[in-house]
Regions:
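N-terminal "domain-start" segment that seeds a small globular fold
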Residues: 47-75
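Structural microenvironment flanking redox-active thiols in thiol-disulfide oxidoreductases
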Residues: 96-135, 145-152
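Bacterial N-terminal signal peptides
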Residues: 26-44
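Hydrophobic beta-strand core positions in alpha/beta domains
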Residues: 84-86, 118, 162-163
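N-terminal secretory signal peptides that target proteins for export/translocation
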Residues: 1-26
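Thiol/disulfide oxidoreductase modules built on the thioredoxin-like
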Residues: 130-137, 145-190
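Short active-site neighborhood of thiol/selenol oxidoreductases, capturing the structured segment around
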Residues: 76-93
Length: 195
């Protein structure tokens, strides 16, 4: 047996596939990381572009509105309950989906001290009532044709849902409606009901 020196060229060739695999893996990891960072940044910018809701953390403006069923409803009479106000219009396409989701919330959490009110901003109360009836709404519908309550709650998009805690403080606002925003809304609602 003779002593052989390792061939440097052969040694490099044997190492190249490992280096290439590592390099390809590193590139893939960096690409995925940059993609996730980009997505996070895009979501953050989208939320940053949304104007802040000035009433968050402040007392909810009191109001009295006429309900479609005939009675008057005053918000301050619901202290001690978690109140959901959903601003909607019969001309809003995503309002129907949101009202159905709120119906499910009421069915699930009514016994925990939850009151849900739909605040219709339609100019025509009859049209608002027909829309709510066709949507199968099971909670009280309040009529705000002059939009005074909508203005006091700074409603700038429909649908818009406002969560008010048992002390009468605005705690969460959901602008528009999507599966993702609905998930966050339900988390916020559960938190308030457990306080």
């Amino acid at each position: 047996m003779s002593w052989q020196q390792p061939n440097p060229a052969r040694h490099d060739v044997a190492q190249r596939p490992v280096a290439r695999r590592w390099s390809a893996g590193a590139c893939t990891s960096v690409t995925v990381l940059l993609g996730a960072l980009g997505l996070t940044l895009a979501v953050a910018l989208a939320y940053a572009a949304e104007p802040p809701y000035a009433l968050l953390g402040h007392e909810a403006p009191d109001f009295a509105l006429h309900a479609a069923a005939g009675e008057n409803v005053r918000l301050s009479e619901h202290r001690g309950e978690v109140v959901v106000l959903s601003f909607w219009s019969s001309r809003c396409t995503s309002c129907r989906t949101q009202l159905a989701a709120l119906n499910r919330s009421l069915a699930t959490y009514a016994s925990a001290g939850l009151s849900v009110y739909g605040v219709g901003v339609d100019d025509d109360p009859v049209q608002a009532q027909e829309f709510a009836r066709s949507a199968g709404v099971g909670f009280a519908l309040l009529l705000d044709p002059a939009k005074t309550v909508s203005r006091s709650y700074q409603v700038d998009n429909l649908p818009m849902t406002v969560l008010i805690d048992r002390n009468g403080t605005v705690r969460y606002v959901m602008r528009d409606y999507s599966a993702a925003s609905s998930t966050v809304y339900l988390q916020q609602l559960r938190t308030l009901l457990n306080e």
